[in-house]
Amino acid sequence: MEMASAFTLNVRLDNIAIITIDVPGEKMNTLKAEFASQVRAIIKQIRENKELRGVVFVSAKPDNFIAGADINMIGNCKTAQEAEVLARQGQQLMAEIHALPIPVIAAIHGACLGGGLELALACHGRVCTDDPKTVLGLPEVQLGLLPGSGGTQRLPRLIGVSTALEMILTGKQLRAKQAVKLGLVDDVVPHSILLEAAVELAKQDRPSSRPLPVRERILAGPLGRALLFKMVGKKTEHKTQGNYPATERILEVVETGLAQGTSSGYDAEARAFGELAMTPQSQALRNIFFASTDVKKDPGSDAPPAPLNSVGILGGGLMGGGIAYVTACKAGLPVRIKDINPRGINHALKYSWDQLEGKVRRRHLKASERDKQLALISGTTDYCGFAHRDLIIEAVFENLELKQQMVAEVEQNCATHTIFASNTSSLPIGDIAAHAARPEQVIGLHFFSPVEKMPLVEIIPHASTSAQTIATTVKLAKKQGKTPIVVRDKAGFYVNRILAPYINEAIRMLTEGERIEHIDAALVKFGFPVGPIQLLDEVGIDTGTKIMPVLEAAYGERFSAPANVVSSILNDDRKGRKNGRGFYLYGQKGRKSKKQVDPAIYPLIGAQGQGRLSAPQVAERCVMLMLNEAVRCLDEQVIRSVRDGDIGAVFGIGFPPFLGGPFRYIDSLGAGEVVAIMQRLATQYGSRFTPCDRLVEMSERGESFWKTTATDLQ
């Protein structure tokens, strides 16, 4: 039986050809190499039908146009030449679409990304819906690649080089109103009239490109271009620290096309695409993509999740406010916040207002939609309105007795099916559930701050948590837009446990004489978004160090922080950015204010600030301890798989994505090399660097954590 086609042609009575995109058996339309023959057959029919007036591409999927190319095609390429051929085939197909003698219009609703936008760019005009689901972008850089089907050449000519570079270098996605303002689309219409609007455009002469703004025309000239690429190159190098080769190649390819013409530009694009596809950075980033997709499909347990119709939150502080926001505004669930103080409720409501009002100001959201989402959140100082909540998230202070009291109160005031989920970062879930009448419905749900930005949550069942409670909590996390990993109920869980020795070692080097800015710069150069000392300031020194004694009590001396350093800093009322002084000093303009190292830190902790270590040596000491602890977590079944370990580190800590996560990174170095480095460091700095047994065994056997495929585990 012949497989259904992803592209089908229908000709209307008014002689407009409608090409419907509908990849069989898939929720999302993605482009595959085998579709080229289908599109070419349709192009041939269009060319042969002299009665046709225009062509419209439209998707049959309810919420996406084309989400991009199928990434598996790249993984199947064994050489740069094979990947280059793939790009050239894509370029050729887009050129054939563009060469049609009648107007070709893309009718866009939902995600139009990567190869999907490149197809739309090959059309002569574009119409999109004003729906929030409609986004347009070229996110290939996030996979260590560049657009390979003409995107680097068509986009700068359509919207201007500086705007195009921002989109291609960052993977930034535009909403409909931004897209029409920049000239990326010709019109924005309601979804109900999308097809008719596209048909009307197709009946006209080919839409002419809007003239570029004067600034963009100047920047496209030789002098403006030279200045622009120099400035953007410098800014990009600072941002990527040279760790992402794709950004450098994007600049090179776009400039080639502008300076030497489209033929040279397309040639450079295809060659760069092929070479980037073979880089370890792209392979690691694609592995992260596959792993995160896999995690999002994981139900957490074999049991079916319980229905989720409404949620309660205990505590209206920073975390409670953030959790209320993602629950109401991302998951779309009614939220009831309980706080002992009305000010706590007001704080939580203001948190959501600020987030939504920012979207309204940026024209990402209508005021009516803001009001609709805010109406989902309400507050109370007692348990009024909690009787039928399906799940309660506790976000009160880190105090065991208080959390146990919350469990008792929820069991008294809520339905018998209600799940109690604690947002603890350090307390054992088993202890929180110790006196529960229904311990099987108690679970940990650990969010990271700021809640609306951090993609990871840890879901922590204790020994008696039911499979259905796990599945229901995983379901909620996904509805909130989070990537959940299920971890074991042991001190520090996973993320904080691997983060603690990393930060401890940074503080230890500080006491040895390394300068604060040198330590932070070394880890940023390695690939972390911020250095460990700045991270401590951002989280809050009081908050970030609270877990240290818990971990030391559980795991011993390797988690001990340098004596008296933390207490000296806290006793000097240094909490980090939140009170304007930590290891750094901050101005008065909140989170955006500039920071500078406070030189008073050095005498306060008895350090000289005269370092001797190179940046790679600093990074090595911090990172090796993190890797060792990650392997211990796998060995102790704190994490269920290396997949979860890599995702947890990348999404929870900012472990360099281009290295693929701790386990991918160990594999790339080789377990033998990691063991050798750690043994050398143990000789130099002490037993905390002793490699764990599993690493030593893997070294002796020549084993790796991951198999060669993207999703299979060893």
From Swiss-Prot:
Residues annotated as site: Important for catalytic activity: 118, 140
The keyword Repeat belongs to this UniProt entry's keyword annotation: no
Chain spans, region Enoyl-CoA hydratase: 1-190
Pfam family, one: 3HCDH_N
Gene Ontology MF terms: 3-hydroxybutyryl-CoA epimerase activity; enoyl-CoA hydratase activity; long-chain-3-hydroxyacyl-CoA dehydrogenase activity; NAD+ binding
Entry's EC annotation: 4.2.1.17, 5.1.2.3, 1.1.1.35
Catalytic activity: a (3S)-3-hydroxyacyl-CoA = a (2E)-enoyl-CoA + H2O; a 4-saturated-(3S)-3-hydroxyacyl-CoA = a (3E)-enoyl-CoA + H2O; a (3S)-3-hydroxyacyl-CoA + NAD(+) = a 3-oxoacyl-CoA + NADH + H(+); (3S)-3-hydroxybutanoyl-CoA = (3R)-3-hydroxybutanoyl-CoA
Chain positions covered by the region annotation 3-hydroxyacyl-CoA dehydrogenase: 306-714
Highest taxon, organism lineage: Bacteria
Involved pathway(s): Lipid metabolism; fatty acid beta-oxidation
Keywords noted in UniProt: Cytoplasm, Fatty acid metabolism, Isomerase, Lipid degradation, Lipid metabolism, Lyase, Multifunctional enzyme, NAD, Oxidoreductase
Gene3D superfamilies noted in UniProt: 1.10.1040.50, 2-enoyl-CoA Hydratase, Chain A, domain 1, NAD(P)-binding Rossmann-like Domain
GO cellular component, one term: cytoplasm
Entry keyword annotation includes Lipid metabolism: yes
Gene Ontology BP term (one): fatty acid beta-oxidation
Subcellular location: Cytoplasm
Family per record: In the N-terminal section; belongs to the enoyl-CoA hydratase/isomerase family.
Function text: Catalyzes the formation of a hydroxyacyl-CoA by addition of water on enoyl-CoA. Also exhibits 3-hydroxyacyl-CoA epimerase and 3-hydroxyacyl-CoA dehydrogenase activities.
Subunit structure and binding partners: Heterotetramer of two alpha chains (FadJ) and two beta chains (FadI).
Name of the featured protein: Fatty acid oxidation complex subunit alpha
Protein source organism: Escherichia coli O1:K1 / APEC
The encoding gene: fadJ
